[in-house]
Each structure stands twice: as structure tokens, then as C-alpha cells.
């Protein structure tokens, strides 16, 4: 097959490797920080050592590469065949930051193992249930996810919850400098370079942290140069409350995957997504997340920022993204890389992510706008967000319920919003506007 650089705008076809690598690398750089940030946040909340965090970062890069390859080139019914980039999901961060300190990191692994298998099966059966999750339900959930992550970003900005110097001047200054670098790069950078604003902020913030003496390099001396990821580094614990709550978030993740897959087909290929592509995308999400748990890592999902990059550049060639996925896997084979990233101060991460989390809120609001402000949609969004966010601010309100219900819902606003939105969507009449007009 002849290689042609013009094939970068075609799904099929070979592109010269010298051209494919930089375009593929661009996709990896666009999602790099978002891929490792959930690991650093959750590992910190669970009290894992820097060595354990480095191991998880290594696994995250390898799993993200594997997941991306399967999305590009489906295996059986797993994968969409579309240029979808996979990475560690932010959707689960808030619930993991509750499960980890409460039941241990092993309970997270057990819940991901079961939840991923369940989502994978649901993906294979997608045509029977996806109609339940309408755009307004997905929009409500995405908005709730953004709100739930704001406190996580703020905690990192202050130096990490529980740290001895939390909220100190040096942490706030470091977080502020990092945030300013992200914003400045986003303002002055041109074209697709804007997609790398978070990466620029991370590098700039890290350099400043080194200059301020806030980085501990002692762990680098023990890091191997090359190593394979470990199988089952954490023995899974299957806690019922953790499994149920994580399964609910897997359903939320599935709705995001549906949206990303549809958006990519529309913006990148100029057509509607096929049912087979949606089902394969969700199945890949679930089963590869379970594989991720086998390596002690967190769930993966499709990355919206890469969907945005496709929409902007129109680079949809699968071979080009394959080059990026291979680079990601190779990077994961060098533990020194993960160990270096594990030395990243919390304040730098907070400066990078605080605006990113706010962007998720805005994305949810934009999704609500696209659904339209009908009386029915307003009722679904208003009730689900007010109950979900409001009730979980006073978790004692759930005290009359069984412990498993409290474990799942009392401090998990995303799960509550998802449940209330689904129920409202099922019971509210489709013709609320016409009924109101007749009443008038």
C-alpha cells in the first residue's frame, strides 16, 4: 500500500512514518496530563507510596496505549474502528477518593474489575438500553461530575489534603504560577498548540517547584531503567458498597463514551455514528478497564480532548494514531519516567487541573443548552442537580437507609444525579409543554 501524507484526513490508508509520528504524538501530548492526573490524585488520597504511584503511572500509559489500539483496530466486537484515544478516566476520581481512604485501594481494584466486566457486557448489549440514557441525562451527569471534582482540584492546589503545609504560601504561589502559565499559553498559543496548555503549565510549574526546593528526587535512585508492568500488584477486595457505587459510575462513563463516539463520527468523518461502533466503543471501555485493574490501575475511557483535536485538525487516520499509541506503550516500559512524574508536587497538579475541572462544568452546561430549555428538560436537570449535589452536602439525610445505600449515595453526588435524572426521564410526560398550554 502506497504511503501518502494526504491520508491523514482519511480513516484508512498509510501515512509516511515520518509524518505519522508527529501527528500521533500530538494526540498523546494533548491527553498526557489528563491520563496521569487521576492516578496521582487517587494514589495521594489512598496514601500510596511514591513507588506505588510510579508503578501505576507506568501501567496507565501501557493500558491507555492498548485501549487506543483496540479502539482503532477492533478485536472481535471490542473497539469502534474509529480514531478514539483512550486514557485513565476522571469520571471516577471523586468516588475513588471516598472508597480508597474508607475501604482501601484494594477495594477500588475489586470494584473496577467487576464494574468493567459489567460495562463490557452492557456494551455488547448496547442496542437494548442506550435509549434510556438520553442527552439531557448525560448532560446532567457531566455537569455533576464537574462540580464534584472542583473540591479535588482545590485540595491539590493547596498542597494536598492532609499535608502538613496545606494552604501554605508556597503552595498557593506555586499553584498560582502554574495556573497562570496554563492560561497564558492558552491565550498566546496558536492553532492546535492551544491543546497543550495544560502540559506547558505542568512543565513550567515543575521547573518552578524545583527552583523552590519543593521536589524530592530521592526516589529516582531506586527506579529501574526498563521494566514490565506487574500483574495483580494489589489483591482485589470485593466490597459490595464499593462495587455498586463504581458500577453506577461505569454507567455514567458509558454515557460519556456514547457522546464522544457520536461527536467524533460527526465532526471527524461527517456522518452519524453506527450502532456497531457505539457498542464496540463501550465494550472496549469496560473490558479494557477490567484489564487495567489486573495491572492495579484505574478504569479507562475515551478522551474528549482528543475528540476536540480531531474536530479541529480533521486528522482521523488510524495508522497515525497507532503511532501515538505505540509511543505511549514504549514510554510505559521505562519506570524512570513514571517515578519522575510521581515527584510532581500537588500544588502543580492543582494549578493544572482546577481550570480543567471547571471546563467540565461548562461542557455539561453546553450539553444542557444543546438539549434545549424545554420545561421537561429544565425539570430533569434542576431536580437531579439539586437533589444530587444538595443532599450529598448533608450526608446525614441518608441515615435512615441501609448501610449499603449510604455507602453508595451519601457522599457521591454523581450517582445520585444519575439515578434521579434516569427516574425523572422515565416518569415525566414527554408532552409537558402541550399539557401546560392546555391548562392555560
Go through each PLM region and give its residues.
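Membrane-embedded alpha-helical modules
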Residues: 99-219, 323-325, 329-437
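Membrane-embedded helical hairpins/re-entrant loop segments and their flanking transmembrane helices
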Residues: 17, 43-79, 247-318, 438-439
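Hydrophobic, membrane-embedded alpha-helices of multi-pass small-molecule transporters
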Residues: 18-30, 167-179, 196-197, 212, ...
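Short, non-helical or kinked segments that cap or interrupt transmembrane helices
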Residues: 55-56, 77-90, 131-140, 194-199, ...
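Helix-boundary and loop/linker segments of multi-pass membrane transporters
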Residues: 9-16, 232-241, 274-275, 374, ...
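Intrinsically disordered, low-complexity non-transmembrane regions of multi-pass membrane transporters
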Residues: 1-23, 217-231, 266, 270-273, ...
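Short juxtamembrane and helix-loop transition motifs at transmembrane-helix boundaries
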Residues: 14-23, 42-52, 68-78, 98-107, ...
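N-terminal signal-anchor module of multipass membrane proteins
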Residues: 1-84, 91-99
Amino acid at each position: 500500500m502506497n504511503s501518502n501524507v494526504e491520508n491523514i484526513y482519511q480513516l484508512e490508508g498509510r501515512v509516511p512514518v515520518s509524518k505519522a509520528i508527529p501527528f500521533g504524538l500530538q494526540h498523546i501530548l494533548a491527553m498526557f496530563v489528563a491520563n496521569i492526573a487521576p492516578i496521582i490524585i487517587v494514589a495521594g488520597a489512598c496514601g500510596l507510596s511514591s513507588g506505588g504511584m510510579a508503578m501505576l503511572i507506568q501501567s496507565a500509559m501501557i493500558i491507555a496505549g492498548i485501549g487506543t489500539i483496540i479502539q482503532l483496530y477492533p478485536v472481535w466486537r471490542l473497539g469502534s474502528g474509529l480514531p478514539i484515544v483512550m486514557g485513565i478516566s476522571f469520571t471516577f476520581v471523586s468516588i475513588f477518593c471516598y472508597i480508597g481512604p474508607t475501604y482501601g485501594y484494594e477495594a477500588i481494584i475489586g470494584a473496577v474489575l467487576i464494574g468493567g466486566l459489567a460495562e463490557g457486557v452492557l456494551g455488547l448489549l448496547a442496542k437494548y438500553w442506550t435509549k434510556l440514557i438520553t442527552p439531557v441525562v448525560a448532560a446532567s451527569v457531566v455537569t455533576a461530575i464537574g462540580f464534584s471534582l472542583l473540591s479535588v482540584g482545590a485540595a491539590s492546589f493547596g498542597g494536598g489534603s492532609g499535608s502538613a503545609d496545606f494552604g501554605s504560601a508556597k503552595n498557593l504561589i506555586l499553584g498560582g504560577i502554574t495556573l497562570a502559565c496554563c492560561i497564558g499559553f492558552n491565550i498566546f498559543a496558536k492553532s492546535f498548540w492551544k491543546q497543550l496548555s495544560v502540559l506547558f503549565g505542568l512543565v513550567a510549574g515543575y521547573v518552578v517547584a524545583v527552583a523552590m526546593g519543593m521536589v524530592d528526587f530521592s526516589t529516582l535512585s531506586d527506579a529501574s531503567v526498563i521494566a514490565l508492568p506487574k500483574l495483580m500488584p494489589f489483591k482485589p477486595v470485593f466490597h459490595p458498597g464499593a462495587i455498586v457505587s463504581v458500577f453506577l459510575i461505569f454507567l455514567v462513563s458509558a454515557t460519556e463514551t456514547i457522546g464522544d463516539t457520536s461527536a467524533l463520527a460527526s465532526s471527524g468523518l461527517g456522518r452519524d455514528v453506527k450502532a456497531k461502533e457505539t457498542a464496540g466503543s463501550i465494550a472496549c471501555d469496560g473490558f479494557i478497564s477490567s484489564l487495567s485493574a489486573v495491572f492495579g490501575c484505574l478504569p479507562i475511557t475515551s478522551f474528549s480532548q482528543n475528540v476536540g483535536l480531531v474536530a479541529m485538525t480533521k486528522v482521523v487516520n488510524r495508522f497515525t494514531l497507532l503511532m501515538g499509541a505505540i509511543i505511549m506503550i514504549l514510554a510505559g516500559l521505562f519506570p524512570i519516567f513514571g517515578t519522575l512524574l510521581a515527584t510532581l508536587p500537588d500544588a502543580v497538579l492543582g494549578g493544572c487541573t482546577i481550570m480543567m475541572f471547571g471546563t467540565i462544568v461548562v461542557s455539561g452546561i453546553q450539553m444542557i443548552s444543546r438539549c434545549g430549555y424545554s420545561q421537561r428538560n429544565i425539570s430533569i436537570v434542576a431536580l437531579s442537580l439539586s437533589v444530587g449535589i444538595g443532599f450529598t452536602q448533608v450526608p446525614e439525610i441518608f441515615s435512615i437507609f441501609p448501610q449499603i445505600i449510604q455507602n453508595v449515595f451519601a457522599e457521591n453526588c454523581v450517582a445520585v444525579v444519575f439515578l434521579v435524572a434516569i427516574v425523572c426521564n422515565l416518569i415525566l410526560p414527554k408532552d409537558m409543554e402541550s399539557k401546560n398550554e392546555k391548562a392555560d
